[in-house]
Amino acid sequence: MNIADVVSGRAKWRGIQWVLFSATACKVLADQLRALLPARALPGPLHPREVRFKPGRELTAYYDARIYREGRETKETCVRPIAVSWGPDTGANWKADIIKAVAEAERHSVAAPFLQLMADFPAWSMRIQVSPLDARFTQLARLSDPRHVRAMLADTYESGKAASHHHQTSDWIVTSIKYRPGRRHVLRYDPGDPASGATLFAKVYIAEEEARAFRREDGARTFRVACDVADAVAEHCRGLNCLRPLAYLAEDAVVLYPRLCGVPLSTYARRLNLDSARWLRRAGAALRTLHRLPVALAGRSEPHDLSAEIRSIVRKSHPIAVLLPHVGSAIEALLDRARELHDRLP
């Protein structure tokens, strides 16, 4: 089996499995990771988190990589998210942007234990990127730097951009929750002393001007819509609340969220009792409130109707039709039926 057959889709789903789990492919990936590390450091287990497949263009896998800093005999390890892409476009000419992103990571000393944060392996049409490298989200490096986080959060609370009674901590532990180069990033900030603060989450956005160029969400609009939705639910649904963001920091194009703990609604859905029914009714009331909100609240000029939704489903399910043709046919029939029923509506 070869990479060209996998990326084209000719190898079907077995090709994806081969790239992700075969001994040959895993050894190649481990060797490339080892080349990015100091002499004594070694890559450990790789845990796949997500896989994206664009037939004919690219296969991308996102891993959490455990790194042994001083060999496998030591207990000193760290976990770093990495993104691995296979395809003809992995060597695209974006060297200038990468150089800028690497320089930012070095300036904030967030590359260690890696000596380099990117590697190309042309023989396999493969590119590896290591968190926090991202040519499009260049602020990710500084948002991964505990020193910058400390200063950023101190300024946020001192300036009143976000209300807090206990965030005067001097140390923050930064963990990458979602590392998706070019697409999205989520970071977790834990106070070094749990008694001195609460855990926060940071959703990173492309700067507003670039977001328009790439047709991507911008943080300012997301923050505004989330706050408006939270206000609407609080007003119309007694005893229910939406997750309300704490602040939008334009300098870093990041939205801060508090940590919430609770039982997932899906857990209640598995139980058939009065308590489950009560929570499901409350969730339904919240959804009804959301559905009745003015469309203008989202701040979008383009309409989004059933046809637009179906186009989106068709686009996102294209890999299924390539890898599992019989499932793709079932999806197509289901969408045709949805169009037919929609046309009958008054």
What spans do the regions from the language model cover?
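AMP-binding/adenylate-forming domain of the ANL superfamily
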Residues: 184-188, 221-228, 310-315, 332-339
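Short, solvent-exposed loop/helix junctions and linker helices
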Residues: 180, 277-280, 346
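Phosphate/pyrophosphate-binding loops and the adjoining catalytic core of nucleotide-dependent enzymes
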Residues: 1-248, 253, 257, 266, ...
